[in-house]
Amino acid sequence: MSIIKEFREFAMRGNVVDLAVGVIIGAAFGKIVSSLVADIIMPPLGLLIGGIDFKQFAVTLRDAQGDIPAVVMHYGVFIQNVFDFLIVAFAIFMAIKLINKLNRKKEEPAAAPAPTKEEVLLAEIRDLLKEQNNRS
């Protein structure tokens, strides 16, 4: 089997295609969540705690000197990214929870199979032995 044919079979499997679609949708969803946090959640939150813009939170480790730029830790951006992560994690958690719930509904418990002739015979022998032991 040629490498190209093997690769084509691998790439066309349902799991690989599903994974690719998931990655693309996930990337687009990440942009939506980032916008939700940056443009919808953080401004009112900043307003509630005194008109603060979290993006502006930073610590300057070294001021700019001539052509050398300043060294700055932007921890406000980090806080915003933490909010992004929490929202994405919660959304994924809820989606997985919903999928699991739907899968459980699909999986109805299978009826117990009827006992085989051997199992019936063994059960009768067991019952007879119990009766003999109880008489003794």
Curated annotation (Swiss-Prot):
Channel that opens in response to stretch forces in the membrane lipid bilayer. May participate in the regulation of osmotic pressure changes within the cell. It comes from the Bacteria. The gene is mscL. The chain crosses the membrane at residues 10-30, 76-96. Belongs to the MscL family. InterPro entries: Mechanosensitive_channel_CS, MS_channel, MSC/AndL, MscL_channel. This is Large-conductance mechanosensitive channel. The keyword Lyase does not apply. Gene3D superfamilies: Large-conductance mechanosensitive channel, MscL, domain 1. Homopentamer. Its main location: membrane. The keyword Amino-acid biosynthesis does not apply. It is a multi-pass membrane protein.
